[in-house]
Curated annotation (Swiss-Prot):
Any GO BP: dipeptide transmembrane transport
Family listed: Belongs to the major facilitator superfamily. Allantoate permease family.
Localization annotation: Endoplasmic reticulum; Membrane
Lineage of origin: Eukaryota, Fungi, Dikarya, Ascomycota, Taphrinomycotina
Residues covered by region (Disordered): 1-20
Transmembrane residue ranges: 69-89, 116-136, 141-161, 173-193, 204-224, 236-256, 303-323, 338-358, 367-387, 396-416, 428-448, 462-482
Keywords, alphabetical: Endoplasmic reticulum, Membrane, Transmembrane, Transmembrane helix, Transport
Protein topology in the membrane: Multi-pass membrane protein
Species of provenance: Schizosaccharomyces pombe (strain 972 / ATCC 24843) (Fission yeast)
Recorded GO CC terms: endoplasmic reticulum; membrane
Protein name according to UniProt: Uncharacterized transporter C757.13
Biased composition (Low complexity): 1-11
Primary localization: endoplasmic reticulum
């Protein structure tokens, strides 16, 4: 049976640095766009438990063992991330279901206030990003997630008791603060547990549960809409969804923070789990916040482009909040609107599945697959805009087609897992990306103004412009990755000593810019 052997060099970082005469020792003063360098000493060491597991240089394991470890990781980690992502999306969009059943009338809010609820949610999301990034690095990741799930679930439950707009606005802001860390945390988890070629499918998988949430949310909304009692149906929406989320959060008390601490793996399986991700060169957890790595994140061209892509792309999210109202405006009642919202979730899931299959076929091409999904969404927007009022069915199909774009967002997030190395840099990158994610989501609902009902044409036109911009950014980012990989190949050909290894350098919390052998996936 074929075996896989861990091959590491025991040469010291001091020896290797002396051979790299062209490399400067001062990171901040020497940083240039595109520069690849190694610091004179490793920036840090791997997690202490990981170092102990990695002590045996002659460790070997079989492909069958690797598959079994992957299966065990999938069995534990994927359901947790998928269901949590579904729950957080249900909590986030409960507002749109509640709006169908009289929430706006009972709480005396107008269309502007309703739009502001989405804006304030993402304002909370925005202000929490950098504090959450630092706390995420300092605290045990699983406990940190548990606390946030518990707190945002409580906010959702409390919305059922609201009797006016200001109370709803305040709770939405707090819910945004507590939900802010979930996607950045899942990006880090995916990077720590999975090989780079496995990451797109896993990211698409847990992101696809936004679509599952839309289907389940529509079913729940339809069922709760049939309740006619002393408590209004819209209040039951918040109560049921909030309690579901509250109960699920307890799971994170038992989830390991990284592979070296996984109780569901034996000692040998932990070592295999680490060896599987060695070639990622992105490390594990590191509790030390490194300002040099944070500085690098802000100047990295790929981070800038990913950040801009995300902010512009989120303008398309307005359709998620207003889809039920757009469908209702086509002539359907509240219950039928809830049911007809279900295909949006089904198309989102289909988009994730198709993208995942294509990613398995092509080693590179995530960004180009995303471009294809964006083009399908663009077609949906044009259908809503250009199809006449006399053809509501055509417009309905257009609304459904707007849900191809989330696959593009998920593929972009997988690039953070795959292409940003160093725990601080990855954490700061995720926070920065989600600051712009928040800005996009703050702007988006303001483009769907109450005076545009029921078509919201200006909002649809804004989506069309944003889709054209992100398609252009995707092509530029693809070109950058191809150029940077070829440049590194050339540097290694000119100076082979750049490719020599330090023992376990893959787990030493080095950034992608500090590793000449690092190659970007696109």
């Amino acid at each position: 049976m074929s075996s896989i052997t861990s091959r590491v060099s025991s040469r010291s970082s001091h020896e290797l640095t002396e051979k790299k005469s062209g490399v400067t020792n001062d990171f901040k003063n020497s940083f240039e766009v595109g520069e690849v360098k190694r610091l004179p000493d490793a920036e840090g060491t791997a997690d202490a438990v990981a170092q102990e597991l990695l002590a045996d240089d002659d460790f070997t394991y079989t492909a069958k063992e690797a598959r079994r470890v992957l299966w065990k990781i999938d069995l534990v980690m994927m359901p947790v991330m998928c269901i949590t992502y579904m729950i957080q999306y249900l909590d986030k969009t409960a507002l749109s279901y509640a709006a169908l059943y009289g929430m706006k009338t009972d709480t005396h809010i107008d269309g502007h206030t309703y739009s502001s609820m989405t804006t304030l949610f993402y304002a909370g999301y925005l202000v929490a990003q950098y504090p959450a990034a630092i706390l995420m690095q300092k605290c045990r990741l699983s406990y940190f997630i548990f606390c946030n799930v518990f707190l945002w679930s409580a906010m959702v439950c409390l919305m059922a008791a609201c009797r006016n707009g200001p109370s709803l606005l305040g709770l939405r802001f707090l819910a945004g603060i507590f939900e802010a860390s979930i996607t950045p945390a899942f990006i880090n988890i995916t990077a720590m547990w999975y090989r780079r070629e496995e990451q797109p499918m896993r990211t698409l998988c847990w992101y696809a549960f936004n679509g599952i949430a839309q289907i389940i949310g529509s079913i729940l909304s339809y069922g709760l809409g049939h309740i006619h009692g002393k408590v209004a149906s819209w209040r039951y929406v918040f109560i049921v969804i909030g309690l579901m989320s509250l109960g699920w959060g307890v799971v994170f008390v038992f989830i390991p923070s990284n592979p070296s601490k996984a109780r569901f793996l034996s000692s040998r399986e932990k070592r295999i789990a680490l060896e599987r991700v060695r070639d990622n060169r992105t490390g594990l957890e590191n509790k030390q916040f490194k300002w040099k790595h944070a500085y690098e994140a802000f100047l990295d061209p790929q981070v800038i482009m990913i950040t801009l892509f995300t902010g512009v792309c989120m303008i398309t999210n307005g359709i998620g909040v207003f889809s039920t109202l757009i469908i209702k405006g086509l002539g359907y009642n509240e219950l039928h609107s809830a049911v007809l919202n279900m295909p949006l979730g089904a198309i989102e899931v289909a988009a994730m599945f198709i993208s995942g299959v294509l990613c398995k076929v092509f080693k590179n091409g995530r960004l180009l697959i995303g471009v294809f999904m964006n083009c399908l969404t663009l077609a949906g927007c044009l259908m809503i805009w250009k199809i006449p009022d006399s053809n509501p069915y055509g417009r309905l199909v257009g609304v459904w087609f707007t849900m191809w774009v989330p696959a593009s967002s998920a593929l972009l997030l997988s690039l953070i897992s795959s292409n940003v190395a160093g725990y601080t840099k990855k954490t700061v990158t995720s926070a920065t990306v989600f600051v712009f994610y928040s800005v996009g989501n703050i702007v988006s609902p303001q483009l769907f103004k109450s005076g545009q009902t029921p078509e919201y044409i200006e909002g649809i036109q804004a989506m069309i412009v944003s889709l054209c911009i992100i398609i252009a950014i995707a092509f530029v980012l693809t070109g950058y990755y191809i150029y940077e990989n070829k440049r590194r190949d050339r540097l290694l050909a000119e100076d082979p000593s750049l490719g020599e290894s330090i023992k376990n350098e893959e787990f030493m919390d080095l950034t992608d810019r500090q590793q000449p052998k690092f190659r970007y996936r696109w």
